[in-house]
Every structure is written in structure tokens, then in C-alpha cells.
């Protein structure tokens, strides 16, 4: 269990458990890490909430919102923002699933990808600014938790879109029900302990977003990819931060 959590932590963030060394992981080990995506999200939630709480009376809210957005992007190696950009480029520039997947493999960022990143960052900064000014910091703990759960929900029983291997293939082809249930349990406990009302709203919002996103990915790409899962994380984070800004 500890090693699976370490896999999730090192895959989703810059962090690494002490006394661990890089090694080649089996597809099953990668899939096992899905269970702990929400727990890694909780760690990232502290990276949202703690600076916001400690520095809110010292640093102007807008400047603090920009700094927190930059911090979380760096801590996650901008992995999910990259997925969002790739998906936007593929959908915006391709005319069929094969062409879209081909565009998504290109390491260069196009106009649609740049626009998607700019909009995601702008929405995050605006929402964080509103939440910081309202002094409601607990919802910030849950936003990355639920967004990482959304990736697990979307991956479960989703076909892999590419014929050849890719970063998301080991996750998508080996995820099992127990991984989903563990992730759901960790998210539910976190929501109950941190902020039950917002947690329930966040889960409902994610539950509505994931099926729609899966349907679109089937239509656009013929299935799911690692880039698409990263894009979903960014979309859900934007929606949840915006919801927190409106609720509080």
C-alpha cells in the first residue's frame, strides 16, 4: 500500500517518498496507484489552502492567487495543463479521431492549446482571488481531491483510444473496481472531515462532469488517453474553484 501511494505521489507531483529509488513499474503497479490519487490531491489541497490562509492578511489576494496557481502548476510539473493543451489542440485542429490523436502526440503547443491553458489559469486565479477575499479556505483542501477522483472515475472501464502504447495505457487497461472504491472512500472521508457541504456539492458536480466528458472523448478520440485524463483534472478544478467562489 505504501509503495502504491508513493507511485501516485511521484507520478502526480514533484514529491517522492523518502528512502525510495526510481525503478521500472509494472502496469499493475501503476494501476494500483489510482487508489491513492485523491490522497495525493489532499496533499496538493494543503498547497492551495495553507498559503491562502497564512498569507491572506499580508499579500494582496490577487497576487496571492497568482502565486498559488503558479506553485501548484510547478508542483504537478504542469502535467495536467499539458494534457489540457494537447486535447484542445487535437480537438480544435483535427477532423477525425486518428488526426486528433496524431496532433495530440506533437510536443508543440498550438493556438488552441495556448488558449486553453490561458483560460484555465485565468479562471483559477479569478476564483482563488474571490475565495481568499471571502476567507473560506477549507474548500480549497477538497478541490484537488475531487479533481483527482474524477480522473479515476473517467478511467474506470474506459477504452484506451490509441492503438499503440502511451502514458495512460497501463492505468486504463488495469484499473479495477477496488481501485475505484478505495479512491471513492478516501474522497468521501476527506469531504466529511473537511467541509461536508462543499464536499457533497463537489462530488455531485464531478459526477455530472465525468460521464459527459467520457462521452465526448469517445466521440472525439474513440476512447480515453492520459492527456484526456489530465485535461479532465483541469476542467474539474476550474469548475470546483468557481463553485467555491460562488458559494462563499
From Swiss-Prot:
GO biological process: cobalamin biosynthetic process
Membrane topology per record: Multi-pass membrane protein
Pathway(s) this gene product operates in, as recorded in its UniProt entry: Cofactor biosynthesis; adenosylcobalamin biosynthesis; adenosylcobalamin from cob(II)yrinate a,c-diamide: step 7/7
Superkingdom of origin: Bacteria
Broadest EC class assigned to this enzyme: transferase
Enzyme Commission designation: 2.7.8.26
InterPro entries the record matches: CobS
Pfam families named among the record's database cross-references: CobS
Any Gene Ontology CC annotation: plasma membrane
Transmembrane segments: 30-50, 54-74, 112-132, 134-154, 188-208
Cofactor: Mg(2+)
Keywords from the UniProt entry: Cell inner membrane, Cell membrane, Cobalamin biosynthesis, Magnesium, Membrane, Transferase, Transmembrane, Transmembrane helix
GO terms of molecular function: adenosylcobinamide-GDP ribazoletransferase activity; cobalamin 5'-phosphate synthase activity
Record's subcellular location: Cell inner membrane
Catalytic reactions on record: alpha-ribazole + adenosylcob(III)inamide-GDP = adenosylcob(III)alamin + GMP + H(+); alpha-ribazole 5'-phosphate + adenosylcob(III)inamide-GDP = adenosylcob(III)alamin 5'-phosphate + GMP + H(+)
Function as written in the Swiss-Prot or TrEMBL entry: Joins adenosylcobinamide-GDP and alpha-ribazole to generate adenosylcobalamin (Ado-cobalamin). Also synthesizes adenosylcobalamin 5'-phosphate from adenosylcobinamide-GDP and alpha-ribazole 5'-phosphate.
Family: Belongs to the CobS family.
NCBIfam families on file: cobS
Protein name (record): Adenosylcobinamide-GDP ribazoletransferase
Gene name, Swiss-Prot/TrEMBL: cobS
Amino acid at each position: 500500500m505504501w509503495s502504491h501511494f508513493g507511485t501516485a505521489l511521484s507520478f502526480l507531483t514533484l514529491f517522492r517518498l523518502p528512502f525510495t529509488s526510481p525503478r521500472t513499474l509494472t502496469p499493475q503497479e501503476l494501476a494500483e496507484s489510482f487508489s491513492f490519487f485523491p490522497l495525493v490531491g489532499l496533499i496538493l489541497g494543503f498547497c492551495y489552502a495553507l498559503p491562502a490562509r497564512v498569507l491572506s492578511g499580508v499579500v494582496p489576494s490577487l497576487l496571492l492567487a497568482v502565486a498559488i496557481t503558479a506553485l501548484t502548476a510547478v508542483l504537478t510539473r504542469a502535467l495536467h495543463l499539458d494534457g489540457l493543451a494537447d486535447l484542445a489542440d487535437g480537438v480544435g485542429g483535427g477532423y477525425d479521431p486518428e488526426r486528433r490523436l496524431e496532433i495530440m502526440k506533437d510536443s508543440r503547443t498550438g493556438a488552441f492549446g495556448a488558449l486553453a491553458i490561458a483560460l484555465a489559469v485565468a479562471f483559477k486565479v479569478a476564483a482563488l482571488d474571490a475565495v481568499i477575499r471571502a476567507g473560506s479556505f477549507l474548500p480549497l483542501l477538497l478541490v484537488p481531491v475531487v479533481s483527482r477522483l474524477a480522473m479515476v472515475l473517467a478511467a474506470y472501464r474506459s477504452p484506451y483510444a490509441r492503438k499503440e502504447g502511451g502514458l495512460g495505457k497501463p492505468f486504463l487497461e488495469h484499473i479495477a473496481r477496488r481501485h475505484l472504491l478505495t479512491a471513492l472512500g478516501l474522497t468521501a472521508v476527506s469531504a466529511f472531515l473537511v467541509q461536508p457541504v462543499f464536499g457533497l456539492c463537489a462530488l455531485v458536480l464531478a459526477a455530472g462532469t465525468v460521464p459527459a466528458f467520457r462521452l465526448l472523448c469517445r466521440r472525439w478520440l474513440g476512447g480515453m488517453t492520459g492527456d484526456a485524463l489530465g485535461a479532465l483534472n483541469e476542467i474539474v478544478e476550474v469548475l470546483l474553484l468557481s463553485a467555491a467562489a460562488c458559494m462563499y
